[in-house]
Amino acid sequence: MPKLTPTERGIAIYNPLVLQIYDYWVLNIVNTWAWRCPTKTHLLPLFVSNIGSNHLDIGVGTGYYLANGTIPQTTRLTLCDLSPTAMAKAKARAGREDARELLCDVLKPLPVRAGEKFDSVSMYFLLHCLPGPVGNKICVFEHVKGVLKEDGVVTGATVLGKGVKDNFFGGLIRRFCVYDGIMSNETDDVESFVEALKANFEVVEVDVIGVVLVFKAMKPKL
């Protein structure tokens, strides 16, 4: 059997069984006790308060945010992910048959319609899953900038791997996730992400909660 690339390995992890338990295990237990950034306290409210009329969700996971974010039916919804399994799960949970699917790699320019711009973009727990060092990932912000309206907003969160201190449980989870290829964030630090955000957006707000970088950016630079 040929060896999987880091990207293929990351996609393979999100099989139906993992997606079945992801919300309870990751978004409830791990986020609260390992990463110390409870989903319902910090991440879901940020998502809910920043949904525009034309929204792009990158790295859809199980569709938790789409299902719990009270997105108006009038909102145009586009889902972007590299995993067909995750995409199908998220679309079903969103309850939006009209949601558009973009099966693509966010490390490459997003294959949206020519001239298409979004009011809002979300990327929760995406960056720490992308393969390679942090320098390989920051191009994502440039790609997002290119599809965001002048008055649009992008929000997200990622588990940092450098410059933060784990508790015992967090250390165990981190070592397992890195070893198993679930996360690739050993060089991911606040400074690199903030620098990349500020290079692409005029307004940048960040906070480190536990070991999670939570961010919001507006006014894409020309």
Curated annotation (Swiss-Prot):
SUPFAM superfamilies named among the record's database cross-references: S-adenosyl-L-methionine-dependent methyltransferases
Catalysed conversion reaction: emodin + S-adenosyl-L-methionine = physcion + S-adenosyl-L-homocysteine
rRNA-binding keyword on record: no
Pathway this chain belongs to: Secondary metabolite biosynthesis
GO MF annotation: an example: methyltransferase activity
EC identifiers of the protein: 2.1.1.-
Superkingdom of source: Eukaryota
Disulfide bonds: none
UniProt entry keywords in alphabetical sequence: Methyltransferase, S-adenosyl-L-methionine, Transferase
Keyword Transferase: yes
Pfam families assigned to the protein according to its UniProt record, in alphabetical order: Methyltransf_12
GO BP term, pick one: methylation
Function per UniProt: O-methyltransferase; part of the gene cluster that mediates the biosynthesis of physcion, a natural anthraquinone fungicide that can prevent plant fungal infections.
Family to which this protein belongs: Belongs to the methyltransferase superfamily.
UniProt-recorded name of the protein: Physcion biosynthesis cluster O-methyltransferase
Origin species: Aspergillus chevalieri
